[in-house]
Structures are given as structure tokens and as C-alpha cells.
């Protein structure tokens, strides 16, 4: 689909009249030590948890500097036929697993794909959890329970209390 002057996931969804959760966006980082690119594909309504991504990669990252030389077109990056100059890593967030009919970048300036089916179009994708947790979201461990986020009253003290309070408040650490 020709999408002139559209660069953000919000703009593309408005242009195509689709909700954010039916889109696949790319977030690009670089590894601190090597400057190799890391391209993260995640559902359009979610954000990347950089701590989870750093833990998965085993090294620190920073937001990428995208230039024409690297082969990426900011605002038009997609998982189909992705090519990046040099060494790079592609990460697919678990939120995309089993999804279809998504919109995404076509890796060509001013163009986007519609109808992306992850299992058909990216059959060998390996999915990991790198999304930020949302209040009311689905549990990334079991996929069933919804998550409730509450404000804490104290952060910074460490006590050897075991599970005394977490059990009494029916809380679970993910």
C-alpha cells in the first residue's frame, strides 16, 4: 500500500483505519559494544521493555542511529524481506505469535504491507517476551490471567521475609 509521508505506527493505523493492536512495529537498537543493530518487532500498541531485551541479548543496548547506509528506512521497517547492512539481530515479541492480518512496514520508503500473517510470512520466527507489562494485560507466563498493577508503598529496603507477605496478599512475581 502506498503510504506517502506516513512515518509512525499511529499515523499508519489512522491511514489504514486499523487499530494499533493489528499492526506490527519495528523498534531499532544498537548494541553498545559492537554497534550491531537489533530490530525488535512488536505489536503496535505495546512498547519494548529494554531491561528484558538487554537480559535476552546479554549486553547493553541504546536507541539506534538509523542512516541510509544501514539499509533501514525509519517508519517503513517490516519483517518481510528485511535486510540490514552488517551484523544484526531480529527479535519477535511474543505478542505477535499467532497473529494475522497485520499492517507493517514494507522496507521501502512510503510503502506498508497489509495482511501480514506471522506464521505464513515469517515461518521461522522465534518469539520472546520483550514487551512492557500493561495493567489489565495478559500474563506472559500462563497467557490466561490478567495482570493488575498497584502502587507500592516502599521500594529500596531488603528483608529476609521469604514469601510471608506475598502469599498473604495473593501476589506473584513474574
Annotate each language-model stretch with its function.
Residues 1-174:
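Extended, low-hydrophobicity, polar/charged segments
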Amino acid at each position: 500500500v502506498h503510504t506517502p509521508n506516513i512515518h509512525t505506527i499511529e499515523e499508519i493505523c489512522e491511514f489504514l483505519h486499523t487499530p494499533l493492536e493489528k499492526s506490527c512495529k519495528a523498534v531499532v537498537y544498537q548494541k553498545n559494544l559492537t554497534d550491531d543493530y537489533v530490530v525488535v518487532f512488536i505489536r503496535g500498541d505495546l512498547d519494548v521493555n529494554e531491561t528484558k531485551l538487554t537480559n535476552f541479548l546479554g549486553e547493553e543496548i541504546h536507541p539506534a542511529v538509523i542512516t541510509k547506509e544501514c539499509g533501514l528506512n525509519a517508519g517503513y521497517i517490516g519483517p518481510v524481506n528485511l535486510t540490514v547492512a552488517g551484523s544484526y539481530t531480529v527479535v519477535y515479541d511474543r505478542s505477535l505469535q499467532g497473529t494475522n492480518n497485520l499492517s507493517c512496514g514494507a522496507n521501502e520508503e512510503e510503502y506498508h504491507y497489509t495482511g501480514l500473517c506471522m506464521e505464513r510470512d515469517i515461518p521461522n520466527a522465534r518469539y520472546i517476551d520483550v514487551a512492557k507489562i500493561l495493567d489489565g494485560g495478559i500474563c506472559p507466563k500462563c497467557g490466561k490471567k490478567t495482570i493488575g498493577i498497584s502502587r507500592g508503598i516502599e521500594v529500596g529496603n531488603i528483608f529476609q521475609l521469604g514469601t510471608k507477605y506475598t502469599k498473604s496478599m495473593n501476589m506473584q512475581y513474574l
